[in-house]
């Protein structure tokens, strides 16, 4: 018996491995895997149902059909183990060998492997340097190919048609060798000398100058070198032996009624075997060439279909007209091996049911129906029953449980105690979609869920279902309790704010409780404390809202950090005093002494967590919930039709709007305004009217008149139920109330355009038929959008996870001094995001100096906490350089300091944290909240866009950066620089507002001057771009020839005449070469020089420029010489929402991107062509100038002779991230992508920490292009992993050799995922065939570094608790020990894991 157990144990041992290599299989290798040749297409005998000998299910080749029993039944039982039966030839062993033993088919004629032939670029074609078309013609027997030319004039690899071949035969006889079919290609491949070929190609590469040729050569060299290094032989891409899959992986299942269901592979194999056998027979018979050829072609097609059906020609279909599933289809796609069985599996010990509310549960509990618990915990119950001696055998225990005896329930109670279960709600968009709870047994059949975790699950109780999973092993239970317990997940990993926040009823209850009311019962009482407040409220002596004085004792930390009690009498209300009783000691009373809305409650929980830690916060959250529910019930807030008060002014506002619309209609009919203007104006009028109605309604709703104690009427905030719900943040918003009691307003058509007749009614009044019909548009579009959005958002998340999955924190500090500058996000006059929110939880990259001094406020490498951020705010620091993952120098993974704080835990991140996946989830999860729309800017919006002045909002000092200006005669500044920025600094030196000042603006006040709020500081004309002179003097026209380069126009209304420069297209012959310009000369007629240069002041005029000056007039510096009208680009579509985020992460180039200056220098224009202008930038140091052709229709923002910096905008448009990376560097592109993505999310009110976006950007910047190879193996122009190049360079530097240089590339997330080092990860993402083909040819090794690869091979992932295991393996490998397969007892494992978890200081998980 003992050796039987030993034998069974030995069977389960897995082999330890460090990496997985994929390569081409040689024929000998295939034969070595095989256990015999499959010679017949038969499967099983239809009478006996036994497998046919030598057939596809042959027992002699693949193993016995029944355990330890040969086919003919001579040997049965275990004692004959390993005997081979002499009658039927079957080895006596377990049946499961039929899952692993392979067979093979000896092909009568070689066939090409379709993957290496047809998967683009064709590997065979690239290797032979022949077009795919030609190779196919050879393979499918249409033409001959010359294998050896011999002494003839035929080239090797030359293609010959039938006639040419016959001619050549006549001419040369057997001096040359030409064949057709796969034999020919095989011979060509076999005869290749790879090393020799490599040499010649490298020589060619050094000599050639053509870019396309270089690219082609580089590709071939890479492929050839891959073959040389991997030890693959090219001729192995042609199959001579075909492996046969083990039969249990392509089963034949008998159905009832004598029919069989079979895997498609069997059909495909049968075709191959039939054709192969027929071909063998024909060859033996020496059949005519044409018949053999046809058979060979058919064999080639059969093998193609088996390997990848439908890749070439029409897919082979089965009896039901469906294409057969080939081997390639088995592994690719959502239903393929990778995504269906390896990355996600169905699990046992799980159940699902509908969820209902459990308002009495504690945060760490969930209600589990008894029926479910009994089923899920069965094995544990059986074990306990046997242990107690209540059942003798498992069978008896089973019976007891089935009968549901009383004792079983007691045992279930014991088993369940302290055994957490996991609850999951699909779709699991982020890690908080699976959390652990302690089950509480309940009657009924629905799972009860704690209301506070609904936000994390995005669950509601309208019929949602959830799944329960039971962690079985001790380790799993420990992880569930320490890491996944709902009490340990209070903060959201996306933004570090509490996610366990009360919503809806609870918020309403707390809001109602903390409101105050004038002249309520019991006003003016003085109470001894919260207890008394509760007593008099219960006794009915005072109202909840009564304003009273209460004696309050607070615990406050003094300057030394000790807790001291402080007692004072506070003006407050009864309700707030009662609420104070549940607030944990250590928080100030001021936190509840205000009407509590949703934001205030969230802030209160956040403060509690930061000051007191995890445990008090969890208890507090529960208490808040119970109290909130109780007082929401007492408040009796309800919705009645009388709560929707329609403002009295509504009718007159609408009437006014209608008269305005009628006026515009009249103007339109008399031709004063165009149709477009009329439409825009009408929409503006109605939008304004809607706003006015809404304002009147809210003023009406939000206050009510009351009589106070002295009998005086005063106003107080309203107790209207609907208003309270919206004001507290419990449900609804001003926009929704507007539709109930104001007017519904303008509606959009499905294409996004606005219908100009608004719905003037609201829901309180009711809609008429037309209004109802107009409303249906929007409602339907909403539903259709939601469906699309969910799919798109899920796909975005999948791509993000895939690109970032292998990014893990691997060391504490990489020691870099680089980082990115963080400044507050300021748009116009508002601070969109203050500095503290952007730097909180980051590590400083440099010392932060106190402004105006040399004192160090915060040293470098300090994690910025709330306290430090307060310090920064007090000292009004307005920019901080922080460490970032983008500039982290760790080779594989990132370091903890560059990442900073773990947002979900509030301390610096632990090693082994999978930050890539967290980032992907944080960005993808809110994706469903983003819109799918592209916004048409029309009407109100576009008019706001054409601003013409800057009006500051606050008092402060002006600060101008990158500015050039001249003073005009009036003593005002005229701006002559392009990207001038204006900041408003307050008295503490903080930036309050930030504006772009366009070229040609006139400013009344300059740099460093004081301004008051509301003052206008700059003006400009938004419709034209001026040409400003920087010097004074007299105008001299140059090349301004009437009728050739200019034309004179006279305005009919004013009688003024002006000159308009003609576009080069409009000029006649001689005018084409003239370049109209305005020169400035002094009184003597000599050129005036531009100050600071030796260039004469002359201003070249582009086409369409308007000049309103005459020759010889005197002008002053800062005057406008000419105006260039700006074409208003109609209604522009702004891509918003989800598609915009996807475009940014895919790094797509915009349609007409901004043109940036490639180098710094002076602008000039060279010779023009028909449709393009030649822009020349000459560097100031006199090195080579840069030229670029720019289409004429692009508007340029630069004039001749202007100096630009590298990366400046030359022509406006959306910027391309690739250009930003090339010209302004990694940090600029990071900033660009981060800001643009944040913009989209900010519009929806979603907060995501910048870190997450930076993590994705780091992954997009993984690759670089080699500029010069130095002493490395790399080829110039090849794309390589940046970390690999850096490692190679470090080695070279140590040896004192030349290092390689490279430029960073920005890849979109899909491309970056496919370009990852790990072929397993890439293959399981997209384009499986292409990835595997490429990897096999190159003989790639997958080092199993990422998470995905390890999940696929069935290991612990190298992150989280699996990180230690992987570190241990690496250490052992480095020391040359053999890694032991851990045989750990459960107790040891628990101890180790506990130690590991404590080391990661994960906060206290003591849920009592």
Curated annotation (Swiss-Prot):
Which annotated residues bind Zn(2+) 2? 814, 888, 895, 898
Q: Which NCBIfam families match?
A: rpoC_TIGR
Protein name listed in UniProt: DNA-directed RNA polymerase subunit beta'
In its keyword annotation, does this UniProt entry include Nucleotidyltransferase? yes
For the ligand (Zn(2+) 1), the binding residues are 70, 72, 85, 88
Protein encoded by which gene: rpoC
What EC identifiers does the entry list?
A: 2.7.7.6
> What terms describe the molecular function in GO for this protein?
DNA binding; DNA-directed RNA polymerase activity; magnesium ion binding; zinc ion binding
């Amino acid at each position: 018996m003992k050796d039987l157990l030993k034998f069974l144990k030995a069977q389960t041992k897995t082999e330890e491995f460090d990496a997985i290599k994929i390569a081409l299989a040689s024929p000998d290798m295939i034969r070595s895997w095989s256990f015999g040749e499959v010679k017949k297409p038969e499967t099983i005998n239809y009478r006996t149902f036994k497998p046919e000998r030598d057939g596809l299910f042959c027992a002699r080749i693949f193993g016995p059909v029944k355990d330890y029993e040969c086919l003919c039944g001579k040997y049965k039982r275990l004692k004959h183990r390993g005997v081979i039966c002499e009658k039927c030839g079957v080895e006596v062993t377990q049946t499961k060998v039929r899952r692993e033993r392979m067979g093979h088919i000896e092909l009568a004629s070689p066939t090409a492997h379709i993957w290496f032939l047809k998967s683009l670029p064709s590997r065979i074609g690239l290797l032979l340097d022949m077009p795919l078309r030609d190779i196919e013609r050879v393979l499918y027997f249409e033409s001959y190919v010359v294998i050896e030319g011999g002494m003839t004039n035929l080239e090797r690899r030359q293609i010959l048609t039938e006639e040419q071949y016959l001619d050549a035969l006549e001419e040369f006889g057997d001096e040359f060798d030409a064949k057709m079919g796969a034999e020919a290609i095989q011979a060509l491949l076999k005869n290749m000398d790879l090393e020799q070929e490599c040499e010649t190609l490298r020589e060619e590469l050094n000599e050639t100058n053509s870019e396309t040729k270089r690219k082609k050569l580089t590709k071939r060299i890479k492929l050839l070198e891959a073959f040389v290094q991997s030890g693959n032989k090219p001729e192995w891409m042609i199959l001579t032996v075909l492996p046969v899959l083990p039969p249990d992986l392509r089963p034949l299942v008998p159905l009832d009624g004598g029919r069989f269901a079979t895997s498609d592979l069997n059909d495909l194999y049968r075709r191959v075997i039939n054709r192969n056998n027929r071909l063998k027979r024909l060859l033996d018979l020496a059949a005519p060439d044409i018949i053999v050829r046809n058979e060979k072609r058919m064999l080639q097609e059969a093998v193609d279909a088996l390997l990848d059906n439908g890749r070439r020609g029409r897919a082979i279909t089965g009896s039901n007209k469906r294409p057969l599933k080939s081997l390639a289809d088995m592994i690719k796609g959502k239903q393929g091996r990778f995504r269906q069985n390896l990355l996600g599996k169905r699990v046992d010990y799980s159940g699902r049911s509908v969820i209902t509310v459990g308002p009495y549960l504690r945060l760490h509990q969930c209600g589990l129906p008894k029926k479910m618990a009994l089923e899920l915990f069965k094995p544990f119950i059986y074990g306990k029953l046997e242990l107690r001696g209540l059942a003798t055998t498992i069978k008896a225990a089973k019976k007891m449980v089935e009968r549901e005896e009383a004792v079983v329930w007691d045992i279930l109670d014991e088993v369940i105690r302290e055994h957490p279960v996991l609850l999951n709600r699909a779709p699991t968009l982020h890690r908080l979609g699976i959390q652990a709870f302690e089950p509480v047994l309940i009657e009924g059949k629905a799972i009860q869920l704690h209301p506070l975790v609904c936000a994390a699950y995005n669950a509601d109780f309208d019929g949602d279902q959830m799944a329960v999973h039971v962690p079985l092993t001790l380790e799993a239970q420990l992880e569930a309790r320490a890491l996944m317990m709902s009490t340990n997940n209070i903060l959201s990993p996306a933004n570090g704010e509490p996610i366990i926040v009360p919503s809806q009823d609870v918020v309403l209850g707390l809001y109602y409780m903390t409101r105050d009311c004038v002249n309520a019962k019991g006003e003016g009482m003085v109470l001894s404390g919260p207890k008394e407040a509760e007593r008099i409220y219960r006794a009915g002596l005072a109202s909840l809202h009564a304003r009273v004085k209460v004696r309050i004792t607070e615990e406050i930390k003094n300057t030394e950090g000790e807790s001291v009690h402080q007692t004072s009498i506070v003006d407050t209300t009864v309700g707030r005093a009662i609420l104070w009783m549940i607030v944990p000691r250590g928080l100030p009373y001021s936190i509840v002494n205000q009407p509590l809305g949703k934001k205030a409650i969230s802030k209160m929980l956040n403060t509690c967590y930061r000051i007191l830690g995890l445990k008090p916060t969890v208890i507090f959250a529960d208490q808040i919930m119970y109290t909130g529910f109780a007082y929401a019930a007492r408040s009796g807030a309800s919705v009645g039709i009388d709560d929707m008060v329609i403002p009295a002014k509504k009718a007159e506002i609408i009437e006014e709007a209608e008269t305005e619309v009628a006026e515009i209609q009249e103007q339109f009919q008399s031709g004063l305004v165009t149709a477009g203007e009329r439409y825009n104006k009408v929409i503006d009028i109605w939008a304004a009217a809607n706003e006015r109605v809404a304002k009147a309604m809210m003023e009406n709703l939000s206050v009510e008149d009351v009589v106070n104690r002295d009998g005086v009427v005063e106003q107080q905030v309203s107790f209207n139920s609907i208003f309270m719900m919206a004001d507290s943040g419990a449900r609804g918003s001003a926009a929704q109330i507007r539709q109930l009691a104001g007017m519904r307003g303008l509606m959009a058509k499905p294409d996004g355009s606005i219908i100009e007749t608004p719905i003037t009614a609201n829901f309180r009044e009711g809609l008429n038929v037309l209004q109802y019909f107009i409303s249906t548009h929007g409602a339907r579009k909403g539903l259709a959008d939601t469906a699309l959005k969910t799919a798109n958002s899920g796909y975005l998340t999948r791509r993000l996870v895939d690109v970032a999955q292998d990014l893990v924190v691997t060391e504490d500090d990489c020691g870099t001094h680089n980082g990115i500058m963080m400044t507050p996000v300021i748009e116009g006059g508002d601070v969109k995001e203050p500095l503290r929110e952007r730097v909180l939880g980051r590590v400083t990259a440099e010392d932060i100096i106190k402004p105006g001094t040399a004192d160090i406020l915060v040293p470098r490498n300090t994690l910025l906490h709330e306290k430090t951020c307060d310090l920064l705010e007090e000292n009004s620091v307005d920019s901080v350089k922080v460490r970032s993952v983008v500039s982290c120098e760790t080779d594989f993974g990132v370091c903890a300091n560059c990442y900073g704080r773990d947002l979900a835990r509030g301390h610096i991140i632990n090693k082994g944290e999978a930050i890539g996946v967290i980032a992907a989830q944080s960005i993808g999860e809110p994706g469903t909240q983003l819109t799918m729309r592209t916004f048409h800017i029309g009407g109100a919006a576009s008019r706001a866009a054409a601003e013409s002045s800057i009006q500051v909002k606050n008092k402060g000092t002006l600060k101008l950066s990158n500015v050039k200006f001249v003073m005009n005669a009036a003593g005002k500044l005229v701006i002559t620089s392009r990207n001038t920025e204006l900041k408003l600094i307050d008295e503490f030196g903080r930036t309050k507002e930030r504006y772009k000042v366009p070229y040609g603006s006139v400013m009344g006040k300059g740099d460093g001057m004081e301004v008051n709020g509301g003052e206008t500081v700059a003006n400009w004309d938004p419709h034209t771009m001026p040409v400003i002179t920087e010097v004074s003097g007299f105008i001299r026209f140059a090349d301004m020839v009437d009728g050739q380069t200019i034309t004179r126009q006279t305005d009919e209304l004013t009688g003024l005449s002006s000159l308009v420069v003609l576009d080069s297209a409009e000029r006649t012959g001689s005018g084409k070469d003239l370049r109209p310009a305005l020169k400035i000369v002094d009184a003597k007629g000599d050129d005036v020089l531009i100050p600071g240069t030796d260039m004469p002041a002359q201003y070249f005029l582009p086409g369409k420029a308007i000049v309103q000056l005459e020759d010889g007039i005197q002008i002053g510096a800062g005057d406008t010489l000419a105006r260039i009208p700006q074409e208003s680009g109609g209604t522009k579509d702004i891509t918003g929402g989800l598609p915009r985020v996807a475009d940014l992460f895919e790094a797509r180039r915009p349609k007409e991107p901004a043109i940036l200056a490639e180098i710094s220098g002076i602008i000039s224009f060279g010779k023009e062509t028909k449709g393009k202008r030649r822009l020349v930038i000459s560097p100031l140091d006199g090195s080579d100038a840069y030229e670029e052709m720019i289409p004429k229709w692009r508007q340029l923002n630069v004039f001749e002779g202007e100096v630009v910096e590298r990366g400046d905008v030359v022509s406006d448009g959306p910027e391309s991230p690739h250009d930003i990376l090339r010209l302004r560097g990694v940090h600029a592109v990071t900033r660009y992508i981060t800001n643009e993505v944040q913009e989209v999310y900010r519009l929806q009110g979603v907060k995501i920490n910048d870190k997450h976006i930076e993590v994705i950007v780091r992954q997009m910047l993984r690759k670089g292009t080699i500029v010069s190879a130095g002493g490395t193996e790399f080829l110039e122009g090849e794309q390589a992993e940046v970390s690999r190049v850096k490692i190679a360079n470090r080695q070279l530097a140590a040896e004192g050799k030349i290092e390689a240089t490279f430029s960073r590339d920005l890849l979109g997330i899909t491309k970056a995922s496919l370009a990852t080092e790990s072929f397993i990860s890439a293959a399981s993402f997209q384009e499986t065939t292409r990835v595997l083909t490429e990897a096999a040819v190159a003989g790639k090794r997958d080092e199993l570094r990422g998470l995905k690869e390890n999940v696929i091979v069935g290991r612990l992932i190298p992150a989280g608790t699996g990180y230690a295991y992987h570190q241990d393996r690496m250490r052992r490998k480095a020391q040359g020990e053999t890694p032991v397969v851990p045989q750990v007892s459960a107790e040891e494992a628990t101890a180790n894991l506990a130690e590991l978890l404590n080391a990661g200081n994960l906060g206290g998980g003591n849920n009592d």
